[in-house]
Structures are given as structure tokens and as C-alpha cells.
Amino acid sequence: MSLLSVMPATTAQQSRAEQVAHHFHWPLVAVEALCPTPLLLWVGPTGLALKSADGKHQHPITAQLQGGSIGLAGPDSWVRGQPLARAVGIKGQHTPTVVDATAGLGGDGWLMARMGCSMHWAERVPLMGLLLQEGLEQAHQDAQRAEVARRVTLHQADAIQLLQNMQEPPQVVYLDPMFPHEGKGSLPRKAMVQLRQLAGEDQDLPQLFELAMATAEQRVVLKRPLKAPLLTRAKPNFQLKGRSTRFDVYATG
């Protein structure tokens, strides 16, 4: 049984909705028809959005790739001193090449690109990859964000295959296996459970971590819940902690 259906907002979006549904083998629902699945991919005039089919949720999920470049000076320059930037090794003019091996909805990956990193995003979940592609296409068309979008290469593929086949190894591999948090801008609790089912579990995370350690030229960064145990017996070289999360940093070179 499918957990996701595709619905056009109006008949003007019918053609694109049909294309998406056919390509991914998702059920297509007529405009304003009763949705037979708990999750709904809404094809609207401004793009794609993920919704809860019960209609109770008012904050659809999209890949919100907002904001332009963050330089060494300016109102947002303080971000370059935050734990994420320090974890991946952004310092002054140095902005490493990073593989975001679990891109998700692009939050951290976009922030790294804003700070100047050359990014490779890997996302194997078709729904997430589709939302990322949509977000990047919109960013390319926006004057403020186009420069950042050009720093990002999206790979709708398994990160293990990507790392095995890259001609030039990245300086950093970034792993964030945590699923999007509940709260403002997320789906209701029941729908989040269903979305996790749709995405599947990262059963191969230990294998991905080992490959990342063998591939990254400088370091592997693993984002974890603040109080979560270490992923492996190997201890990180250092940790950077925030309010609810931490970054375990493993040097490779």
C-alpha cells in the first residue's frame, strides 16, 4: 500500500502531476478529491510541497533553500563561527569540498554552500530528492541565491555508490542521519511517523561511515542528538556541542 499520493492544485498543474506520479509510480488523485493515502505531494503553481492528507497541517514541507552567500563580513558573518562551520573546517577563506551524504531537505547542506563550500548532495529517497531538485531549480532562478545554487551538485543516488565512484575524493564527508525534527514547519506526529516509513531506516550507516573515513581527505563530520551514544567504538578527535545536537569530528588526514 502506498503512503503517498500526488495531487494537482488546479487543472493547470494536471500535466506535471501526471508526469511526477508516472515517473515515481505514485497514485494520482484528482483535484480536491479524497486522498487515499496519509501523505500528499501537492503540485501547486509555485512548486511541490508535502502535506498531511487529513488537511489539518498548515505548514507544508518543502526544501527551503533560503538566503544568499555569507561572506567574511556582513550581517550574517557570525554564522561562520558557529559549530557547523567549525566542524567542517570553514576558516577564513578556506571552504572545503563537502559531500553531504544524507542531504535530507538540504538545511545544513545549503548553509555550507552559503558559506562558500563546494557541495555534493547525495539523497537516495526519491521524495526528498524531488523536493531538493525543486528547491535548487527555484534557487537558480533567484538573483540572490543563484550563486549559492551553483555551488551545489545534487546526486539522487545512494551515498555509498557516490563515494565509491567519485573521481576526486572530497575533503570532508558530512553525515546527518537524524530525521527532520518535529515542531513548527513539520508534519503532525502521525504523519512524521509515516514519512519516516516512506524514507526507510539508515541500516547501512555504519558501512557509510567506514567508507567516508576511507574517502575523505581531511575529516568526517557526524551530526548526532546531543546525548546520543557514539556511532562506533572509534572516538572522535573532537566534538562541538549545541543545545540539542552535537558534531562528532573524525580526522582522516
Curated annotation (Swiss-Prot):
Residue ranges the record marks as coiled coil: none
Gene3D superfamilies according to UniProt: Vaccinia Virus protein VP39 (3.40.50.150)
Residues annotated for S-adenosyl-L-methionine binding in this entry: 123-124, 176
GO cellular component terms, semicolon-separated: cytoplasm
EC number(s) from the headed UniProt entry: 2.1.1.242
Cell compartments where the protein resides: Cytoplasm
Family recorded in the similarity comment: Belongs to the methyltransferase superfamily. RsmJ family.
Name of the protein described by the UniProt record: Ribosomal RNA small subunit methyltransferase J
